[in-house]
């Protein structure tokens, strides 16, 4: 059999002998929940003479690769934008057969119709197979999962069989349950072919099936930090057999605050392990983690060294105001849904916005579903399945799905709310244009996001994208201190209204209505402050004054159609007026805008006209 051979016969039955190091027949310990995850775990003081030695260098350079000159290697790396740092880095493989994987692995690769390794696979496989620690920095959708899974299979095949009570040989830590499940789906097919066992453990799902998998013994465990900490604390599994550690999307795990849990977990693993860290960015926090966990590692970077987006994505930025987003989204979805390939992810900032927007769109007949962290695992799995199979081609999501969500045919990404950082922006739009395909990303950028405008322009320029002139204007206004309106951009909607008739903005003159009040309901109430601090209220939709208007201590009722009552003006005189009085004074001795007496407007269907609040 070509490829890597080992003394492990996967066909023979596995007997349960005496437990080796790391195992116990005493059964699982009863555990309790703690406020500080992992505080029950004690850092192990490793004596490397105690556990058995293990082999981690299995790399056999293919003859075709050995004949390749240094100049040819450099030309290939330059063409694929591969940057390598570290000593004695192996040459990249240009074809699958040059990696010398076992025949059953090659059969699965052939069934999946892969033509050639991606850039991160070409350079990452020789490094991982050599037993070296490595850091891989590459954009989303670049094939990172197979970059560490296939060398893991080779590594496992050269280790002794698991005994009862042994933990996994390969541990993959992932930031979210969605990413963990996707890694498990990729691993499952290769594990079946190689007669290995894998499992996925994550929060939000029943513990029973996950515990049974661990007790039966698995070579590969894909886990989120929180659930793994739970199982380690109560003795459901252990990591003393773990010799191959993968930190997938390390930057995301740090963003989510998992660093203490990661350190607790790594303390349970023998220090002579092989460690592979994968990330889409290379901030100082990730660099520090690499320095702490990795030894003499090889750093592989795919693409530009600075923050960069996938160049296969067309990025379109629309500078607008918050109240315009809904209408713009509907117009955009009408165009997208007319396309044959129309699978779309809409990213929003909050869980509440996700639920509200999902309800609005479904109410108006759009095939949309929402996903965020507060939904149950069963509901999240169902929503993702419906989205993947095209039954609901519009997915509205918070950042819980912005990384690791691997759906091959996502054609469009819409940033309804701009994220908090350009790193998150790059990860969001990276849900499209997976595996060398193309895609389009639309972004609604408001003046409230002005702090991110410079970084966004840098990302657009690096990817050779057209830059909206309004973005450049925001930078100019911000730099010169000429910021106008809320958030630094002039509110040009006011120019569409003549003086005294800005019903969408002010009831009375702007300066004297500075501290007006608004309600958040569809029927907007405008308030004008009087001398004594009371407020009048005008219902925007039916043209009538509401009840209980108070001015200078006098309570007066205003009713639709024929308002009568008393009103005290700025000269402390009281006048009686009826329905035909043309000029009312507002307590500040200024002319009030006369609302037309119109019939009540019907409920406005979504999307709402620009004259109404959105």
UniProtKB/Swiss-Prot annotation:
PTM section of the record: Sumoylated; sumoylation, promoted by PIAS1, promotes interaction with HDAC1 and transcriptional repression activity. Sumoylation also significantly increases stability, and reduces polyubiquitination. Polyubiquitinated, leading to proteasomal degradation.
Transmembrane segments: none
UniProt GO MF annotations: ATP binding; ATP hydrolysis activity; mRNA 3'-UTR binding; nuclear androgen receptor binding; promoter-specific chromatin binding; ribonucleoprotein complex binding; RNA helicase activity
Gene3D superfamilies reported in the protein's UniProt record: P-loop containing nucleotide triphosphate hydrolases (3.40.50.300)
Position of sequence motif Q motif: 94-122
DEAD box (motif): residue ranges: 248-251
Keyword Nucleotide-binding: yes
Described purpose of this protein according to its UniProt entry: Involved in the alternative regulation of pre-mRNA splicing; its RNA helicase activity is necessary for increasing tau exon 10 inclusion and occurs in a RBM4-dependent manner. Binds to the tau pre-mRNA in the stem-loop region downstream of exon 10. The rate of ATP hydrolysis is highly stimulated by single-stranded RNA. Involved in transcriptional regulation; the function is independent of the RNA helicase activity. Transcriptional coactivator for androgen receptor AR but probably not ESR1.
Protein name: Probable ATP-dependent RNA helicase DDX5
Organism: Pongo abelii (Sumatran orangutan)
Gene: DDX5
């Amino acid at each position: 059999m070509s490829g890597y051979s080992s003394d492990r016969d996967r066909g023979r039955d596995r007997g349960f002998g005496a437990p080796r190091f790391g195992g116990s027949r005493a059964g699982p310990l009863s555990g309790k929940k703690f406020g500080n995850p992992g505080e029950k775990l004690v850092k192990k003081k490793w004596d490397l003479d105690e556990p058995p030695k293990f082999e981690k260098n299995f790399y056999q350079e293919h003859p075709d690769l050995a004949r390749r000159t240094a100049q040819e290697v450099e030309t290939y790396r330059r063409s694929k934008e591969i940057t390598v740092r570290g000593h004695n880095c192996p040459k990249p493989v240009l074809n699958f057969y040059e990696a010398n994987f076992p025949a059953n692995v090659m059969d699965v690769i052939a069934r999946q119709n892969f033509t050639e390794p991606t850039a991160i696979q070409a350079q990452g496989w020789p490094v991982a197979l050599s037993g070296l620690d490595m850091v891989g920095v590459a954009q989303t959708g670049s094939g990172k999962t197979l970059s560490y899974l296939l060398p893991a299979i080779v590594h496992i095949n050269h280790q002794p069989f698991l005994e009862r009570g042994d933990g996994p040989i390969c541990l993959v830590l992932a930031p979210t349950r969605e990413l963990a499940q996707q890694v498990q789906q990729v691993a499952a097919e290769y594990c079946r072919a190689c007669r290995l066992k894998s499992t996925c453990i994550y929060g939000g799902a029943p513990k029973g099936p996950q515990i049974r998998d661990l007790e039966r013994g698995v070579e590969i465990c894909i886990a989120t930090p929180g659930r793994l900490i739970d199982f380690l604390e109560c003795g459901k599994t252990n990591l003393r057999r773990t010799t191959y550690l993968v930190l997938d999307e390390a930057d995301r795990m740090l963003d989510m605050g998992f660093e203490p849990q990661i350190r607790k977990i790594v303390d349970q693993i023998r220090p002579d392990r092989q460690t592979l860290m994968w990330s889409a960015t290379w901030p100082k926090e990730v660099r520090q983690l690499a320095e702490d966990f990795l030894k003499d590692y090889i750093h592989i970077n795919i693409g530009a060294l600075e923050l960069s987006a996938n160049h296969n994505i067309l990025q379109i930025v629309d500078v607008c105001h918050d109240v315009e987003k809904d209408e713009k989204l509907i117009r955009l979805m009408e165009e997208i849904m007319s396309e044959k390939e129309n699978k779309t992810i809409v990213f929003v900032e909050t869980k509440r916005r996700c639920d509200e927007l999902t309800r609005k769109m479904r109410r108006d007949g759009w095939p949309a579903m929402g996903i965020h962290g507060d939904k149950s695992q069963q509901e999240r799995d169902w929503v993702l399945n419906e989205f993947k199979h095209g039954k609901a081609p519009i997915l509205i999501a918070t950042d819980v799905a912005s990384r690791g969500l691997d759906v091959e045919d996502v054609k469009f990404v819409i940033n309804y709310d701009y994220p908090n950082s350009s790193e998150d922006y790059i990860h969001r739009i990276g849900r499209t244009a997976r595996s060398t395909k193309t895609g389009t990303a639309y972004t609604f950028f408001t003046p409230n996001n002005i702090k991110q405008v410079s970084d966004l322009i840098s990302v657009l320029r690096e990817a050779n994208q057209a830059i909206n002139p309004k973005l450049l204007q925001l930078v100019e206004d911000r730099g010169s201190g000429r910021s106008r309106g809320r958030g630094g951009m002039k509110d040009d909607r006011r120019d569409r209204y003549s003086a005294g008739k800005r019903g969408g903005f002010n009831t009375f003159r702007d300066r004297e209505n500075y501290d007006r009040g608004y309600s958040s309901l569809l029927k907007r109430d405008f308030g004008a402050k009087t001398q004594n601090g009371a407020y009048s209220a005008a219902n925007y939709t039916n043209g009538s004054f509401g009840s209980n208007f108070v001015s200078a201590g006098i309570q007066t009722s205003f009713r639709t159609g024929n308002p009568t009552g008393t009103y005290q003006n700025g000269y402390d005189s009281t006048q009686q007026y009826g329905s035909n009085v043309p000029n009312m004074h507002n307590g500040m001795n200024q002319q009030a805008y006369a609302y037309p007496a119109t019939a009540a407007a019907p409920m406005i269907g979504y999307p709402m006209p620009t004259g109404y609040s959105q």
